[in-house]
């Protein structure tokens, strides 16, 4: 388990030091936020706005909070900013139910992690360290539910020019399997 945790640590450290080609101007971010607020029928609070803006400027972002704190609403504005500016995005979650919730809330199709990676067998994936996903942004919801092994597979499949956003509640039940990666990152 130590080896997997060290691989995760080293990959995240390496990716965090790289700059991506992804840039959205502050004006376009404000416009996307405005569109998301109009569609949702409410305005973001200061903390949510800060999280949205930071997530759109950083290579790796973690969004955490209890149920009902607006993580999914925040994600809607982030998705809107990327899609309105012609960036590609993959949205994944551990369960199909969580993926469906993301799809409904953001109007962007989400999939299970296994489907995103193209599962072809036990711990075998089409997208992996030798064949990266081609996407501008990789979003993982319910990150607190993902064990270290699956998290490593997901992380290895992400290209160095891809932004990473992980959301979750580190106070939820820990993942099935070893490694509580999200809590460790917080």
Features from the language model and the residues they span:
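Conserved ATP-binding/catalytic motifs of P-loop helicase motor domains
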Residues: 1-186
């Amino acid at each position: 388990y130590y080896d997997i945790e060290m691989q995760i640590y080293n990959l995240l450290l390496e990716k965090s030091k790289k700059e991506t080609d992804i840039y959205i101007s502050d004006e376009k971010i404000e416009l996307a936020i405005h569109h998301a607020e109009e569609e949702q029928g409410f305005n973001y609070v200061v903390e949510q706005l800060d999280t949205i803006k930071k997530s759109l400027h950083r290579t790796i972002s973690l969004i955490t909070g209890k149920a009902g704190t607006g993580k999914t609403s925040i994600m809607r504005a982030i998705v809107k900013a990327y899609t309105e500016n012609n960036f590609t995005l993959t949205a994944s979650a551990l369960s199909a139910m969580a993926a469906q919730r993301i799809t409904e809330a953001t109007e962007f199709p989400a999939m299970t992690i296994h489907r995103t990676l193209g599962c072809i067998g036990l711990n075998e994936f089409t997208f992996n360290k030798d064949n990266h996903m081609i996407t501008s942004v990789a979003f993982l919801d319910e990150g607190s539910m993902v064990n270290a092994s699956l998290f490593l597979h997901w992380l290895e499949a992400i290209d160095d020019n891809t932004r990473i956003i992980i959301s979750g509640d580190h106070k939820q039940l820990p993942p099935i399997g070893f490694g509580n990666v999200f809590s460790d990152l917080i």
